[in-house]
């Protein structure tokens, strides 16, 4: 029976691997190297439509990207305040658990900040990720108007020669290696995106499309890895978290939709691309969705990368500052009492 689920090649493996780990009471192990190979392929597919005109359009939209980032992160901060008020989890953990950054990035940051509950942060980010990964593809595929860009359906008609395929494969792999060397976030995907886009612009050549079965296989490999990283046995440890976090996720999604509509009206890009650009998902999940629905991957990557870099480079200092001020205020109130 066909369930007509959004992103079946990604979400199916996530669900079955996570549930399988729950049934067998221990997590599955999935090769990081296999996941990285899949991400290189997906990153190449996202970078190949890039052109010089696309780059100029993205640069002109940078103020909008930064504004969208600040609004989305602020909405996540408001969700953290609600979580703190309605649960027994400390404010530091709520802040790190509710901000729409990547699961791994927020967990690493939580491990570096005193008083952060690593388990609580992991569970909150996992629940947020699961909500976003299921809801956003559904909205984009079944609710929003179709995107105007060519999607993966064209892939079979744009196969390149063996020499072209080998050349661009080498470009994508070298991009991933270089990105890892200089410690870029999500290097196996971001590296090929940037290297492929740069090569296309510099050489003024058309990159061969990736056949649909290859993209589907890559989605399965990435989905299986995400599913193996989810530990559903820990969800019962924090009673009352789910409802507040779900409400917070819906709030951030509404904010993202409003931002997407505004950006679509201001820039003329299609609504699917604008929504995926502002949605609080990870670069991997939103990138796969963009490929499936035929959205403008280059614009989506630019917006998502702006937020990702802000969260990784700037937000840690903001989070530490907020936590410091909160502790100072709490200490002052305790002293008065």
Roles of regions detected by a PLM:
Residues 30-42, 62-67, 88-99, 122-125, ...:
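Cytoplasmic-side transmembrane-helix entry/capping segments in multi-pass membrane proteins
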Residues 129-169:
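Long hydrophobic alpha-helical segments that form multi-pass transmembrane helix bundles
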Residues 1-34, 41-54, 75, 159, ...:
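Structural signature of multi-pass alpha-helical membrane transport proteins
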Residues 86-127, 269-303:
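Alpha-helical membrane segments and immediately flanking helix-loop junctions
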Residues 71-72, 100-106, 122-144, 255, ...:
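Membrane-embedded alpha-helical segments of transport systems
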Residues 95, 105, 117-120, 145-162, ...:
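Intrinsically disordered, low-complexity non-transmembrane regions of multi-pass membrane transporters
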Residues 52-60, 143-159, 204-211, 236-237, ...:
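Membrane-interface helix termini and inter-helical loops of multi-pass transporters
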Residues 26-28, 47-61, 77-92, 261-266:
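Transmembrane alpha-helix boundary signature
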């Amino acid at each position: 029976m066909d369930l007509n689920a959004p992103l079946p090649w990604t979400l199916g493996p996530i669900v079955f691997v996570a549930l399988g780990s729950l049934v067998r009471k221990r997590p599955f192990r999935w090769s990081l190297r296999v996941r990285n190979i899949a991400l290189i392929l997906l990153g190449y597919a996202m970078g190949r439509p890039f052109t010089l005109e696309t780059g100029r359009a993205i640069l002109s939209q940078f103020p909008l990207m930064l504004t969208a980032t600040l609004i989305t992160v602020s909405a996540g901060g408001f969700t953290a305040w609600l979580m703190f008020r309605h649960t027994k989890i400390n404010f530091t953990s709520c802040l790190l658990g509710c901000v729409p950054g990547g699961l791994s990035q927020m967990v690493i940051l939580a491990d570096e900040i005193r008083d952060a509950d690593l388990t609580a942060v992991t569970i909150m980010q996992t629940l947020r990720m699961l909500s976003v990964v299921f809801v956003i593809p559904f909205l984009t595929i079944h609710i929003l108007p179709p995107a105007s860009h060519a999607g993966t359906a064209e892939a079979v008609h744009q196969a390149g020669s063996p020499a072209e395929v080998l050349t661009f494969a080498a470009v994508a792999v070298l991009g991933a290696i270089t990105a890892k060397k200089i410690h870029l976030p999500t290097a196996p995907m971001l590296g090929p995106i940037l290297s492929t886009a740069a090569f296309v612009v510099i050489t003024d050549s058309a990159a061969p499309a990736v056949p649909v079965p290859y993209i589907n296989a890559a989605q399965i490999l990435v989905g299986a890895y995400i599913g193996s990283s989810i530990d559903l046995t820990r969800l019962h440890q924090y009673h009352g978290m789910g409802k507040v976090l779900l409400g917070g996720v819906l709030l951030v999604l509404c904010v993202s939709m409003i931002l997407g509509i505004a950006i679509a009206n201001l820039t003329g890009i299609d609504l699917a691309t604008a929504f995926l650009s502002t949605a609080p998902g990870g670069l991997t999940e939103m990138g796969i969705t963009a490929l499936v629905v035929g959205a403008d991957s280059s614009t989506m990557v630019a917006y998502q990368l702006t937020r990702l870099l802000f969260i990784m480079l700037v937000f840690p200092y903001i989070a530490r500052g907020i936590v410091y001020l909160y502790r100072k205020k709490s200490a002052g109130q305790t002293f008065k009492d």
